[in-house]
Amino acid sequence: MAEVQQLRVQEAVDAMVKSVERENIRKMQGLMFRCSANCCEDNQASMQQVHQCIERCHAPLAQAQALVTSELERFQDRLARCTMHCNDKAKDSMDAGSKELQVKRQLDSCVAKCVDDHMHLIPTMTKKIKESLSSIGK
C-alpha cells in the first residue's frame, strides 16, 4: 500500500518538475548560454573579465535551481513528517495491544491521508515556483 502511495506522489512531483523545466528553466538555460557566448565574443576582455561575465550569466539559473530544490525539499520534509506521525501512531497502537492487521490498516489509511493532503499542495507549490522563477533575472 505504501509503495502505491509513494508512486502517486513521485509521479505527480515528476510531472510538476517536467512542467517547470520545460516552461521556465529551459528558457533560462537558453538565456544563460547565449549570454555566456556573448561574454566569449568580447576580444578586448581579459580572461578574468570573461569568467566574471559568464558567472553573472549563470547566476539567475543557479538561483532558479536552488529555489526549485528548496521547495521540493520543503515538500518532501513535510510529507516525511506526516508519515512519521503515522508510524508513531501505529507503534503506539501496537504498544497498547492492538492487533497487527488493525494497526496495518490504520497505518495505510493514515499514510494515504498524508499523500492525499500533500497531493493537494502540489498545484500551489507549482504556482509559487513558477511565479518566483518569473521574477528571477528581471
UniProtKB/Swiss-Prot annotation:
The modification N-acetylalanine is found at residue 2. Keywords: Acetylation, Phosphoprotein. This is Protein FAM136A. GO terms for cellular component: cytoplasm; mitochondrion. The modification Phosphothreonine is found at residues 124, 126. Belongs to the FAM136 family. It comes from Rattus norvegicus.
